[in-house]
From Swiss-Prot:
It catalyses: a quinone + NADH + 5 H(+)(in) = a quinol + NAD(+) + 4 H(+)(out). It is found in: Cell inner membrane. This is NADH-quinone oxidoreductase subunit K. NDH-1 shuttles electrons from NADH, via FMN and iron-sulfur (Fe-S) centers, to quinones in the respiratory chain. The immediate electron acceptor for the enzyme in this species is believed to be ubiquinone. Couples the redox reaction to proton translocation (for every two electrons transferred, four hydrogen ions are translocated across the cytoplasmic membrane), and thus conserves the redox energy in a proton gradient. NCBIfam families: PRK05715.1-2, PRK05715.1-3, PRK05715.1-5. Keywords: Cell inner membrane, Cell membrane, Membrane, NAD, Quinone, Translocase, Transmembrane, Transmembrane helix, Transport, Ubiquinone. It is an enzyme of class 7 (translocase). It comes from Ruegeria pomeroyi (strain ATCC 700808 / DSM 15171 / DSS-3).
Length: 101
């Protein structure tokens, strides 16, 4: 049977991969967004694992809310990137600093 330790190990591994994605790739904004989504997925796995371990549904309900917010964040972030790419022709992190606003 798969225990709580296995889920926590998988979640910790995903979180570390997301952290490495943030720190090692500073050029591409899409990879940064994907790394943040990977970290949120690791948090959701932790919430569901502890919720199942404790026999409480609050963690699973909270995970649904986190997934909803993460989907909205990804959609808005990608929409901003598409508009930025149309205006500037690039999505490098260094060029995002020159945005007006």
């Amino acid at each position: 049977m798969i225990g709580l330790e296995h889920y926590l190990t998988v979640a910790a591994t995903l979180f570390v991969i997301g952290i490495f994605g943030l720190f090692l790739n500073r050029k591409n904004v899409i990879v940064l967004l994907m790394s943040i989504e990977l970290m949120l997925l690791a948090v959701n796995i932790n919430l569901v694992a502890f919720s199942s371990f404790l026999g409480d549904l609050v963690g699973q309900v909270f995970t649904l809310f986190v997934l909803t917010v993460a989907a909205a964040e990804a959609a808005i972030g990608l929409a901003i990137l598409v508009c930025f790419f149309r205006n500037r022709g690039t999505i490098d992190v260094e060029d995002v600093n020159v945005m007006k606003g």
